[in-house]
Amino acid sequence: KTEINNSISPLTRFLLLAGVVYAGWQLLYDLVLLPDGRLDTFLSLSGVRLASGLLTLLGWDVEISGRVITCLGHRGVEINNGCNGLHLLGLYAGFIIAYPGPWKQRTLFLTGGLILLYLANAVRIGFFAVFNASLPEYWHVAHDYSSYVFFYPIVLSFWYLWTVYNQQEQIIAAS
């Protein structure tokens, strides 16, 4: 086993493991989570409720009905499966799992990052409701590019911090 591990570069090992984790996530989602629907439903409904609370706190009059959030007097926004952040949560977790590091710290990065992404999705849902009330003609632009504003900075920052943290741990362990 040591000879095999030493003959594969760390990058190749990471890419192989990331591919296996991603394929496993896709199979789990397609064969178990999607048909069951409970996790998607939870993320959609709770995201709408959190967004409603946030907007109410900010002074907006909102109404929710299941997966739909509406700024009163305007069209609502429905949060469907596939738009509730679950796919991105899986990708984020896959990277953290695939990149080497101690499991205790990995668990902290996973938990913290997943919670932050979940909350960012609630903010994103609130943004959709306000944007749809204010600029409905540009809805598709906001929807298509919102991940670049709400999710990717968080994911890339946590991924970066995870790699930097592990490089420092390796330097400390080697000295």
Which residues make up each language-model segment?
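Hydrophobic N-terminal alpha-helices or hydrophobic patches in metabolic proteins across all domains
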Residues: K1-S175
